[in-house]
């Protein structure tokens, strides 16, 4: 009897017809994708995107040249040169470079920073035409921080209970 049923299924192409109807049902269903350049999807506050150096509200840069981010970076993508000590005993960076080609976006630099100076912001659209444009210097990082400060501060505030 089972041989007869198997022959009937083969003759009527039952698997083919059921697969065809499944494909047609999926073809005419609403698509879950978004039209990317024109529509933006949700980005988590914990998203790790383009790096930025932050400033204090008075305009002074936050980085105290402790070099913890440089020491903890597994890809060795961060290079820092510290300036001389100032009268108040603090130091600031003379040079702060990140090689974004080497960076693996692990977030260790952000976690290690005691003053929340280096952060990974919400920007994920930073494609370049040349490799040299992915070597970020201090000015580029400070410019990113100024551009994304509102979003960065909001994300840090929302993430604070989990740290």
From Swiss-Prot:
<keyword id="KW-0408">Iron</keyword>
<feature type="binding site">
    <location>
        <position position="73"/>
    </location>
    <ligand>
        <name>[4Fe-4S] cluster 2</name>
    </ligand>
</feature>
<keyword id="KW-0874">Quinone</keyword>
<feature type="binding site">
    <location>
        <position position="109"/>
    </location>
    <ligand>
        <name>[4Fe-4S] cluster 2</name>
    </ligand>
</feature>
<keyword id="KW-0479">Metal-binding</keyword>
<dbReference type="GO" id="GO:0005506">
    <property type="term" value="F:iron ion binding"/>
</dbReference>
<keyword id="KW-0411">Iron-sulfur</keyword>
<feature type="domain" description="4Fe-4S ferredoxin-type 2">
    <location>
        <begin position="94"/>
        <end position="123"/>
    </location>
</feature>
<feature type="binding site">
    <location>
        <position position="66"/>
    </location>
    <ligand>
        <name>[4Fe-4S] cluster 1</name>
    </ligand>
</feature>
<dbReference type="GO" id="GO:0048038">
    <property type="term" value="F:quinone binding"/>
</dbReference>
<keyword id="KW-0677">Repeat</keyword>
<dbReference type="GO" id="GO:0051539">
    <property type="term" value="F:4 iron, 4 sulfur cluster binding"/>
</dbReference>
<keyword id="KW-0997">Cell inner membrane</keyword>
<keyword id="KW-0472">Membrane</keyword>
<dbReference type="InterPro" id="IPR017896">
    <property type="entry name" value="4Fe4S_Fe-S-bd"/>
</dbReference>
<feature type="binding site">
    <location>
        <position position="69"/>
    </location>
    <ligand>
        <name>[4Fe-4S] cluster 1</name>
    </ligand>
</feature>
<dbReference type="GO" id="GO:0005886">
    <property type="term" value="C:plasma membrane"/>
</dbReference>
<feature type="binding site">
    <location>
        <position position="103"/>
    </location>
    <ligand>
        <name>[4Fe-4S] cluster 2</name>
    </ligand>
</feature>
<comment type="similarity">
    <text>Belongs to the complex I 23 kDa subunit family.</text>
</comment>
<dbReference type="Pfam" id="PF12838">
    <property type="entry name" value="Fer4_7"/>
</dbReference>
<comment type="subunit">
    <text>NDH-1 is composed of 14 different subunits. Subunits NuoA, H, J, K, L, M, N constitute the membrane sector of the complex.</text>
</comment>
<keyword id="KW-0520">NAD</keyword>
<protein>
    <recommendedName>
        <fullName>NADH-quinone oxidoreductase subunit I</fullName>
        <ecNumber>7.1.1.-</ecNumber>
    </recommendedName>
</protein>
<dbReference type="GO" id="GO:0050136">
    <property type="term" value="F:NADH:ubiquinone reductase (non-electrogenic) activity"/>
</dbReference>
<feature type="binding site">
    <location>
        <position position="63"/>
    </location>
    <ligand>
        <name>[4Fe-4S] cluster 1</name>
    </ligand>
</feature>
<keyword id="KW-1003">Cell membrane</keyword>
<feature type="domain" description="4Fe-4S ferredoxin-type 1">
    <location>
        <begin position="53"/>
        <end position="83"/>
    </location>
</feature>
<keyword id="KW-0004">4Fe-4S</keyword>
<keyword id="KW-0830">Ubiquinone</keyword>
<dbReference type="InterPro" id="IPR017900">
    <property type="entry name" value="4Fe4S_Fe_S_CS"/>
</dbReference>
<dbReference type="InterPro" id="IPR010226">
    <property type="entry name" value="NADH_quinone_OxRdtase_chainI"/>
</dbReference>
<feature type="binding site">
    <location>
        <position position="106"/>
    </location>
    <ligand>
        <name>[4Fe-4S] cluster 2</name>
    </ligand>
</feature>
<dbReference type="GO" id="GO:0009060">
    <property type="term" value="P:aerobic respiration"/>
</dbReference>
<comment type="function">
    <text>NDH-1 shuttles electrons from NADH, via FMN and iron-sulfur (Fe-S) centers, to quinones in the respiratory chain. The immediate electron acceptor for the enzyme in this species is believed to be ubiquinone. Couples the redox reaction to proton translocation (for every two electrons transferred, four hydrogen ions are translocated across the cytoplasmic membrane), and thus conserves the redox energy in a proton gradient.</text>
</comment>
<keyword id="KW-1278">Translocase</keyword>
<feature type="binding site">
    <location>
        <position position="113"/>
    </location>
    <ligand>
        <name>[4Fe-4S] cluster 1</name>
    </ligand>
</feature>
